[in-house]
Amino acid sequence: MFNHNEAILYEWVKENEPELFARIQRKVKEGKWHIMGGWYLQPDCNMPNGESIIRNISEGQRFFEKEFGVRPTTAINFDSFGHSVGLVQILNQAGYDTYVVCRPAKEQFPFREQDYLWKGLAGSEVLVHRSDENYNSVYGHVGKELEQFLEDTKDEPVSFCLLYTSDAADDLI
């Protein structure tokens, strides 16, 4: 199953490759492509104020509802350098129940668990998965990386399962 998250990237595909966009729409309907994230553009959450983040989410969700008939419930922000405690409440009010991040990296801020419940303001909470791996893979190495992922996680309970691949996927869409 494929997924991607930023509305602006889908817009560019729609404008520049309409046939590919139509194929993606079909794959979403078939359940072979999952819309996650839902932001218009993946933000850095250190500087923007809450209103900016809310508008970013609203624009992205509007696009995905119009073009695909879906509203994502998992927010993705792989490469943000900050996650304000106020973000939890914004995510909850936008309909998200899960949040996927890569930062802070385990070397910068070690947690015992990759998956945890983040409690924010006004009783809001969201299940977070912090990936300890990169969010891409080297072309041609997906099989090797998948084997390593399965070996590394064979004894761990699974609450989130994320696998990042970047090999060409023309045959799938």
Locate predicted features.
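Catalytic-domain carbohydrate-binding cleft regions of carbohydrate-active enzymes
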Residues: 1-166
